[in-house]
């Protein structure tokens, strides 16, 4: 079995953490789901685009998927910052997610800027 890259590991961890947070928040206050949905979509899109890039049809397709993942990571960071200020995400989880995203953004940036 092929070794999983650090980028894939981090994007999987991001996805797992955001899904767990989302499921918990929806049980607490379903009425707020429209505020939580954008983070769920953008965070899971990071990993999905990284996974798609592994099967890219060309170098241009690969770079495009990684650029989309980079943009989605930036959007995820935006939502985390605002949901933390709104007290929808606790500081410990926020710090963990922001650290993961910083690592992911750095790795993606170095990949797309080659």
Where are these regions (language model features)?
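Amphipathic alpha-helical assembly/interaction segments
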Residues: 1-114
């Amino acid at each position: 079995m092929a070794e999983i890259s650090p980028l894939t590991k981090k994007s999987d961890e991001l996805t797992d953490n955001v899904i767990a947070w989302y499921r918990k928040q929806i049980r607490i206050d379903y009425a707020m789901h429209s505020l939580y949905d954008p983070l769920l979509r953008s965070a899971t899109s990071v990993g999905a685009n990284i996974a798609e890039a592994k099967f890219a049809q060309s170098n241009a397709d690969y770079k495009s998927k990684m650029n989309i993942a980079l943009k989605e990571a930036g959007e995820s960071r935006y939502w985390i910052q605002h949901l933390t200020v709104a007290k929808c995400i606790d500081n410990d989880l926020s710090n963990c997610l922001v650290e993961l995203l910083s690592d992911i953004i750095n790795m993606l940036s170095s990949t797309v800027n080659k």
